[in-house]
Amino acid sequence: MRENSWLSYTEEDDKNVEVLAQEYKEFLSKCKTERECTQYFIKEAESHGYQDLNKLIAQGNRLKAGDKVYGVGMGKTIALFQIGKQPLTEGMNILCAHIDSPRLDLKQNPLYEDTELSFMDTHYYGGIKKYQWVALPLALHGVVAKKDGTVVNVNIGEDPADPVVYVTDLLIHLAGKQMEKKGSVVVEGENLDILVGSRPLAGEEKDAVKANILRLLKEKYQMEEEDFLSAEIEVVPAGPARDCGLDRSMIAGYGHDDRVCAYPSFAAMMEAGHVDRTSCCLLVDKEEIGSVGATGMQSMFFENTVAEILALMGQDSNLAVRRALARSRMLSSDVSAAYDPAYAEAFEKKNCAYFGKGMVINKYTGARGKSGSNDANAEYLARLRRIFDDNKVAFQTAELGKVDYGGGGTIAYIAALYGMEVVDSGVAVLSMHAPWEVTS
């Protein structure tokens, strides 16, 4: 077993860890959706000299070694590049992570009233234990796109003066039959509706509580009920990330999966000096539901962005794109399950991740015989071992859990379709996919 890194830290290391942890907690507390993450990264990148790719294309500017550029996909995914001295066709060093997290999404017609209580209907996003999302203070984050083209940002429940919303649960005194159900159905997905009001609007004879909610939304966001049809509003745990443990050695918060990988990947790009080989940080959406859609890893966004960059370097050919991608090397950063002694039966101790033992390398993920995994090449792993050891980087190797106990997938296999070297790597997490997760 690897040494606990806390034991080898110097006083300066401890200070650096504390600084990074504080910055990360601020990010995690503010950025709870893929849109919010992307906007944060754009602002920070521009302050570090990165330029918008679309503006460079419009101006016909050429790219050269040392230039920094970013491309954005529909406000939900972002790719950042620092051009190296070597030709881009020799490949890139890529850090990739996802910025979506499990949550509840409002349906397109969400608002209703029942017995003078007003609710909003939701559809859960990603793999969740549905019973974990009841009886918690929740917040609303998202956007409302109106017919006139304006887009209104929604954020309710994060300011201490804000109200929160809530999914009700059945009191234990009446829950005899409920407690006999399997965990997967003890709370049904269709019952994950958020309670948003109970005060009727004076003068309204029908659905007066709902009418009052609509009045409040119109006052604050100038929106009508029909505007829900073109809204993307996510229901997430309310409140900031917190230090966890009496020794403050851990962080509890929403969205560690996968922002605990996305944030340091981005930070590494911002701190990088001049590079010989082009560096890239790719932060994508929709991983939790299969990397689908125009902003997921299965889309053409990344390939198209690389093609545009090559064109600005005078290499406007399909072959150049293929060579640049095939000769790249990627760390596909996603969280790994940390060993939990309370559920020891799910883990194989020799091949699992532990807090304090360094970043986690997963040669493969998947389930039922590695199905759906990338399975990194031994030669690539040897190369990474040498780099990590030469630079005194603490790392460990792990599988998700015991064979045939379950499994999971990442974006690694999708990137590997280009022929590049890819390995899963990331951070160990306790209570993965819960509303509040814990990392070291």
Annotate each predicted stretch with a short phrase.
Residues 1-440:
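N-terminal hydrophobic/helix-forming segments and targeting peptides
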